[in-house]
Amino acid sequence: MSAEEAIRGAMAEVPKAVAAGLVDMGSGMMLSIKTVDSHPQAVLDILAPATKEMFEGEMVTTIENLFKKARGVESAEHYFREILVASTNLWHYFGRLKSNEEIVLVVVCRADVNLGMLVMKARQVAHNATV
């Protein structure tokens, strides 16, 4: 499945989706994005680095490492799998792909979305995508 196919799937499957994208955490680059609205290019330009910061910023990795140390775990695995953010008019879902945790699916939905359906459908896309 290509990045574009995954994004088309997210836009079609996730209720009230207004935008979807895939972020490569390794490069900090956006692999693909689709939006039904126009957004300032400056916002689109910082979406990938902002996503990387949320999942793998210095303080986040410090927290992960403290949990690992407390549990006696030696692993490169990331604990933080999904993040759900509420803004004034939108919900923003961020979730690592099952096939490659270095790729994060981003889905933006209108604020009146059923949150259970948003998470369930976004998880299905993240589970099935093989980018």
Residue locations for each model-derived region?
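Non-catalytic interaction/Regulatory regions outside core domains
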Residues: M1-V131
